[in-house]
């Protein structure tokens, strides 16, 4: 979701708000596409160059090629790195060395419609399915480190029985998708009726109700050990989200940081070290 207004954004919002009143069905369809279209910057595509020391490969998911990278020996237990909405695999790069040094194989990938992976539209159920496929193809996955929406995907993949991880590190995870959609709607001056229509359309597209995608709803029945790391100064995904997830996940540990925000937390040495120590602990 954008973080600042501009004259062009205001103009777009005015046109969208007007069309929502005159053509609500069209506005709902447009809103659905907007909500399922991640931002894809030039940096995201160029970021693959930061992963040249890894072995690259692709898997096919629903006709789309998903880019993957691997470090470490094939015989070693694996850790999967799952980035969040609008992100890309290279953002998780700082977690690689501590894990490889500890004897793990590390797998990163670009989510559908992100980075150099194919696609234009995607959503949380796709994230969960692709995470499960990546883990299944590589095998021997002991843990996952997931950022933002990637964390919700990890919880959903576990809850659906599509993946099995002994340990999960959730960095800045969301706890309230409906609340996020309401912020999204306010940003684009979207009437609540259109937002509800958008939610219904997305639920129909994926065949699942949104409340069944919420991490606090699925977490109580999960047995994987969890470490939740969240920054108190995160303005995109407030700290209360991570605290809520940790409270609902049985036995979860909560690590709080300060001054890192939503993205710099991924490259902080204290965070990457804590994640590696949690995964390697017996």
Regions found by a protein language model. Name each.
Residues 159-208:
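Hydrolase active-site cap/lid region
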């Amino acid at each position: 979701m954008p973080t600042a207004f501009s004259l062009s954004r205001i103009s777009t919002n005015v046109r969208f708000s007007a069309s929502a009143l005159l053509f609500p069905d069209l506005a709902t369809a447009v809103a659905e596409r907007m909500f399922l279209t991640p931002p894809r910057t030039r940096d995201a595509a160029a970021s693959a160059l930061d992963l040249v020391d890894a072995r690259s490969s692709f898997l096919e998911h629903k006709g789309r090629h998903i880019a993957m990278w691997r470090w470490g020996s094939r015989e070693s237990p694996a850790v999967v790195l799952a980035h969040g909405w609008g992100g890309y695999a290279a953002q998780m790069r700082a977690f690689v060395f501590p894990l490889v040094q500890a004897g793990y194989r590390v797998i990163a990938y670009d989510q559908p419609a992100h980075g150099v992976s194919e696609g234009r539209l995607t959503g949380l159920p796709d994230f969960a399915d692709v995470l499960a496929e990546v883990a299944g193809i590589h095998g021997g996955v002991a843990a996952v480190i997931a950022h933002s929406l990637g964390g919700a995907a990890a919880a959903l993949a576990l809850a659906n029985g599509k993946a099995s991880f002994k340990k999960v590190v959730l960095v800045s995870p969301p706890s309230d998708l409906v609340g996020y959609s309401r912020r999204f709607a306010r940003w684009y001056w979207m009437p609540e009726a259109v937002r509800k229509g958008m939610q219904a359309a997305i639920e129909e597209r994926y065949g699942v109700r949104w409340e069944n995608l919420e991490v606090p709803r699925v977490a109580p029945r999960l047995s994987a050990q969890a470490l939740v790391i969240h920054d108190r100064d995160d303005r995109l995904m407030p700290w209360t989200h991570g605290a809520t997830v940790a409270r609902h996940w049985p036995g979860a540990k909560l690590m709080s940081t300060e001054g890192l925000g939503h993205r710099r937390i991924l490259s902080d040495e204290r965070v990457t070290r804590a994640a590696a120590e949690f995964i390697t602990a017996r």
